[in-house]
């Protein structure tokens, strides 16, 4: 994008992702207007967590502004499963969004699978995650008319990296990040692990770090497969050799030492708190927040599912 040309040339500075988010939201808005579509989302909020409440407000405002009917329901968590099933069976509902955590742990994983994959705008169901890890692009197999959805936050970061001009489109599909080293400090099933798989699928070597250690993600021998391997590389070594560093530790006490980060590294932060000192922008490229692009990807996923559903009628 032209907005980032100077930052990328200088290999330092702070990136505001608003232009990227606006680009994709404008695409969504144009499709809705052109086709006279009326997509509807039902979102469930069970928590009093201020972060979840704020995110639900931002999502609702963005969707309504872009022509999406957004119904936000404050519900008791013990009632959530029945309400999700009700929304699954409602033909007027095209997307379902749950603000996690609800119970936490395996109970939340269960709820993610209660949401029908055909309405799972977050892409968190087992089927959607299986499709991602096996690079399956369509929900209807060889018919290839119903596109899969990808988890919103990982997809947002891929789009940010792409719009910063890091993807080499002159290379073959699956090699656009060939020669790039990425470190992700987060291996959650919602963000870190799917993101590692996506970037590895695009040709990068990915160091995936969590409290249990480091795993390397690379593209496998067969197209669309991922190879995982153990490594003796330390956290500090992985960070210091990275072209792209992605941080997602939900603690204000976690900070990466700026001395470990090489000049010109792209540092993307998706945690609610900044996992690196803001002064890193004086020698590297800092993307401090990605939330606006995540919401844009949510809208994009909704339209994909809406289109899949109306094609059945």
UniProtKB/Swiss-Prot annotation:
Binding site for NAD(+): 187-188, 210-211, 270-272
Keywords of this entry: NAD, One-carbon metabolism, Oxidoreductase, Purine biosynthesis
Gene3D superfamilies: Leucine Dehydrogenase, chain A, domain 1, NAD(P)-binding Rossmann-like Domain
Listed pathway(s): One-carbon metabolism; tetrahydrofolate interconversion
One Gene Ontology biological process: tetrahydrofolate interconversion
This protein's GO CC annotations: cytosol
Active site as annotated: 152
GO MF, one example: methylenetetrahydrofolate dehydrogenase (NADP+) activity
Record-listed E.C. numbers: 1.5.1.15
Domain of life, source organism: Eukaryota
InterPro entries tied to this protein: Aminoacid_DH-like_N_sf, m-THF_DH_NAD-bd, NAD(P)-bd_dom_sf, THF_DH/CycHdrlase, THF_DH/CycHdrlase_cat_dom, THF_DH/CycHdrlase_NAD-bd_dom
Catalytic activity: (6R)-5,10-methylene-5,6,7,8-tetrahydrofolate + NAD(+) = (6R)-5,10-methenyltetrahydrofolate + NADH
Family: Belongs to the tetrahydrofolate dehydrogenase/cyclohydrolase family.
Free-text function comment from the UniProt entry: Catalyzes oxidation of cytoplasmic one-carbon units for purine biosynthesis.
SUBUNIT field: Homodimer.
Protein name according to UniProt: Methylenetetrahydrofolate dehydrogenase [NAD(+)]
Organism: Dictyostelium discoideum (Social amoeba)
Lineage: Eukaryota, Amoebozoa, Evosea, Eumycetozoa, Dictyostelia
The gene coding this protein: thfA
């Amino acid at each position: 994008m032209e907005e980032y040309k100077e930052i990328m040339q200088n290999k330092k500075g702070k990136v505001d992702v608003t232009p990227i988010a606006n680009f994709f939201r404008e695409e969504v808005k144009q499709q809705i207007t052109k086709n006279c579509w009326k997509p509807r989302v039902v979102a469930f909020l069970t928590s009093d967590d201020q972060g979840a409440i704020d995110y639900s407000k931002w999502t609702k405002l963005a969707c309504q502004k872009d022509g999406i009917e957004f119904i936000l329901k404050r519900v008791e968590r013990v009632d959530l499963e029945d309400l999700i099933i009700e929304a699954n069976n409602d033909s007027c509902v095209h997307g379902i969004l749950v603000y996690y955590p609800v119970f936490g742990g395996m109970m939340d994983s269960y709820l993610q699978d209660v949401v029908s994959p055909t309405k799972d705008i977050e892409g968190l169901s087992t089927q959607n995650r299986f499709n991602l890890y096996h690079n399956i692009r369509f929900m209807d197999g060889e018919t290839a008319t119903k596109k899969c959805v990808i988890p919103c936050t990982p997809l947002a970061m891929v789009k940010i990296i792409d719009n910063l001009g890091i993807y080499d489109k002159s290379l073959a599909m699956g090699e656009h990040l060939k020669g790039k080293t990425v470190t992700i400090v987060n291996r959650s099933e919602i963000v870190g692990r799917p993101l590692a798989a996506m970037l590895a699928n695009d040709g990068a070597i990915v160091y995936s770090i969590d409290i249990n250690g480091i795993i390397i993600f690379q593209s496998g021998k067969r197209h669309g497969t991922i190879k995982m391997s153990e490594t003796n590389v330390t956290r500090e070594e992985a960070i210091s050799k990275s072209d792209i560093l992605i941080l997602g530790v939900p603690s204000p006490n976690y900070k990466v030492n700026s001395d470990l980060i090489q000049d010109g590294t792209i540092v993307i932060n998706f945690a609610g708190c900044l996992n690196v000192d803001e002064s890193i922008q004086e020698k590297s490229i800092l993307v401090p927040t990605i939330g606006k692009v995540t919401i844009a990807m949510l809208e994009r996923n909704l339209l994909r599912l809406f289109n899949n559903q109306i094609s059945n009628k």
